[in-house]
Amino acid sequence: MLATDASPPVPLNVASPDCAEEFFAGAAVRCVTLRHAASLAELREVLERCLDDPAQTVTLDLIGHSTRGHRLLRLGRTPIDMLDPHVAGFFHALARDQLLTRLQVTAVRLLGCETAVTDAGQRTLRMLSHTVRLPVFGTRKPLFKSHSNSAGFDPAFAHILIEAAATRAGHGAGPVRSP
């Protein structure tokens, strides 16, 4: 099999329970496989349980509301802010333990409203990418249920994502294609 024949990564959808049900509710089937994590500890548990799943490349899609002001993704009550030593330590531990590598994660996407528009959001994207040594994407627009399909985030809307590295080159110089 050639590298170009590889199938695209599938999303590993992990949502904050405070938004998941209302966000994906409706007549259209959206995000069929959805796991919940209301804290970083629960996120770790979800990821460890996924080690038993069949091997395949995945994007780790963290789904939740963003905070007011800084627009940081929130899992439960915890904003994903890499300046917070607890949050940074959590992701350092994931990297040290190679948990994302063992899960074949190829990218992390912080799927909440406008998680890549503020300086704080862009800094978190860059620091998280540096820590986990993977591309990390945030959103440039508010997210709605229409941005999802049965698998999760709809690739047709990849243009509203921006990769952490692109935020260095002039505050979101343009989208970098999301996996």
What are these regions (language model features)?
Residues G138-P179:
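Caspase-like cysteine protease fold
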Residues L62-I63, H70-H147:
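Catalytic cores of nucleophile-dependent amide-cleaving enzymes
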